[in-house]
Curated annotation (Swiss-Prot):
Entry annotated with the keyword Nuclease: yes
GO MF assignments: 3'-tRNA processing endoribonuclease activity; ribonuclease P activity; tRNA binding
Family: Belongs to the RnpA family.
GO cellular component: ribonuclease P complex
Keywords, ordered alphabetically: Endonuclease, Hydrolase, Nuclease, RNA-binding, tRNA processing
Oligomeric and partner information: Consists of a catalytic RNA component (M1 or rnpB) and a protein subunit.
PROSITE patterns: RIBONUCLEASE_P (PS00648)
Keyword Amino-acid biosynthesis: no
Gene Ontology biological process: tRNA 5'-leader removal
Enzyme Commission number: 3.1.26.5
Reaction catalysis annotation: Endonucleolytic cleavage of RNA, removing 5'-extranucleotides from tRNA precursor
Protein name from the UniProt record: Ribonuclease P protein component
Amino acid sequence: MTISYTFTRELRLLTPAQFKSVFSKPIKASSAEITLLAIPNTEQHPRIGLTVAKRFVKKAHQRNRIKRIIRDNFRLHQHELPAIDIVVLVRNGVVEMENAELHKLVEKLWRKLNRRYNG
């Protein structure tokens, strides 16, 4: 069996109801810049939803860069995560981070979330 590193529609939270369900009693993993909220899902794979507020990241190209990096990191680490729905909340300070720095932070948060879910 080969592992697929694609990021398909099935790996995303799409509806407001899916997002809202994550906010009720979530498992949290956070840093100063990013918070991950997660709940178990009924799928066989993790799903992700991203929220990058204009209040914290003013310019569209900056919001897109942040979302692209987080999505790519999720795509590469999806097989290490349990079957959970994850909402990523981006806060102030993430704009100043370099791409590599953001990748490392998100990887650290995936591990933290995994430990909290399994532990």
